[in-house]
Regions:
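Short N-terminal regulatory/linker segments that flank and modulate the kinase catalytic core
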Residues: 1-22, 107-172, 274, 329-332
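C-terminal lobe helix-coil module of Hanks-type protein kinase domains
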Residues: 19-22, 33-36, 61-71, 79-85, ...
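Conserved N-lobe loop of protein kinases adjacent to the ATP-binding glycine-rich P-loop
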Residues: 36-44
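Residues on conserved beta-strands of the protein kinase catalytic domain
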Residues: 42, 90-91, 277
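Conserved beta3-strand ATP-binding lysine motif
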Residues: 47-50
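Alpha-helical transmembrane signal-anchor helices
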Residues: 351-382
Length: 382
């Protein structure tokens, strides 16, 4: 049955022309519902301010500014903001409702996959991440805004599929996810918008293999003044970059959150294991995550290098932009050298062989033939 708005009179089951269907998620900046936009007969994700915030004029102002900032983002990998309103003192905005699954929900199956090279038959829908090879490029791929998978995504109704990917394909799928997300973040950053809470639950993978960045409701519009205090800690602690504890947050902090998300997909383990907030904060500020290949030995070296560069404790050692991270992920997928590794002759030759496998095989065959003919010739001469 439809649910009322939390903290508001129980009779409130609609806002404007939206009928509330169910709560699907909540975070520090609001509660998200699945709702029906009755005028257009379509489902949307509707995000409202938490009750305690509706009396705070500054909070409301920030909420509206952030919704407007997110609405400016028009990219195929960002959940679009499609409406902003207020009804009976309740402030809300609406987003496209994405059918898919948050990466946080995939981590348990990812762990089973990496540990046993299979997905347990638990009746859950198998994600494209584990069931098929994702395309390197999607039609109209770009960037877009959104919210937690639990916030704007529904459980896919696609039929259950057995996992068919091998480990090599899985690792490439992780790189493809990272590339889509990095492209999207680069677009948002170019518009002056930071996400500030990049994490697995804010990345939704739909049935077509497209990743959607969700919950720009914690974003900071770089063109807005005075709405976020310099020392505010906005975001989920586990995925906060070390500099955020000093009140510093820039594009490299979003790169860090994406890097940690990819780290977990590659290792099926959290980057840090602090049991308390204080211990976790200390680890984030002082310690680098364990090396990826010490956790999952067969992760391709270049992919591990990219993710480790993105998650460097010192922001000066990270990718300076999401675009530079995207370029390295694209280079990895295309078999080209990545900028994060020192280009030794052996590395460049190996990359060239990976990229031109057919030509390399032909040349090696020809070389072996020449060697064989030379040996036979010398033998005949003797």
């Amino acid at each position: 049955s439809p649910r009322s708005i939390v903290g508001v009179d129980a009779s409130v089951k609609r806002l404007g022309n939206y009928r509330i269907l169910r709560e699907v998620g909540r975070g520090g900046m609001g509660v998200v519902y699945e709702a029906l936009q009755e005028t257009l007969d379509r489902r949307v994700a509707l995000k409202v301010l938490p009750p305690h915030a509706m009396l705070d004029a500054q909070f409301v102002s920030r909420f509206r500014i952030e919704a407007q900032a997110a609405a400016r983002l028009q990219h195929p990998n960002i959940v679009p903001v499609i409406g902003l309103g207020e009804d009976r003192g309740i402030h809300y905005y609406t987003m496209r409702f994405i059918e898919g699954e948050g990466l946080d929900r995939l981590l348990d199956r990812t762990r089973a996959f990496l540990d046993g090279d299979s997905v347990p038959g638990n009746g859950a829908v198998t994600s494209p991440l584990l069931a098929t090879e994702l395309p390197d490029r999607l039609p109209g791929s770009g960037v877009s805004s959104g919210s937690e998978p639990s916030v704007v995504s529904g459980v896919s109704d696609a039929p259950e599929r057995a996992a068919r990917v091998d480990r090599k394909t899985y690792f490439r799928n992780v790189a493809r996810i990272g590339l889509q997300a990095a492209d999207a973040l680069a677009y948002a950053h170019a518009q002056g918008v930071l996400h500030r809470d990049v994490k697995p639950s804010n990345l939704i993978l739909d049935d077509g293999g497209r990743i959607w960045i969700a919950d720009f409701g914690l974003c900071r519009d770089e063109t807005a003044e005075g709405l976020t205090q310099a020392g505010d800690l906005v975001g989920t602690l586990h995925y906060l970059a070390p500099e955020c504890f000093r009140g510093v947050h820039d594009v490299r902090s979003d790169v860090y959150g994406l890097g940690l998300t990819l780290y977990e997909l590659l290792t099926a383990r959290p980057a840090r294991d602090g049991s308390t907030r204080a211990a976790l904060a200390r680890q984030i500020a002082e310690e680098s995550p364990p090396r990826i290949r010490s956790q999952t030995a067969d992760v391709p070296r270049d992919l591990a290098t990219i993710v480790e560069k993105a998650t460097a404790t010192n922001p000066m050692r990270r990718y300076a932009t999401a675009d530079s991270m995207a370029k390295d992920l694209r280079a990895f997928l295309e078999g080209r050298p990545i900028s994060a590794r020192t280009p030794s002759l052996g590395y460049l030759l190996a990359a060239s062989v990976r990229r031109h496998k057919a030509l390399a095989a032909t040349l090696i065959t020809a070389l072996l033939a020449v060697i064989l003919l030379t040996v036979l010739y010398v033998h005949d001469v003797k």
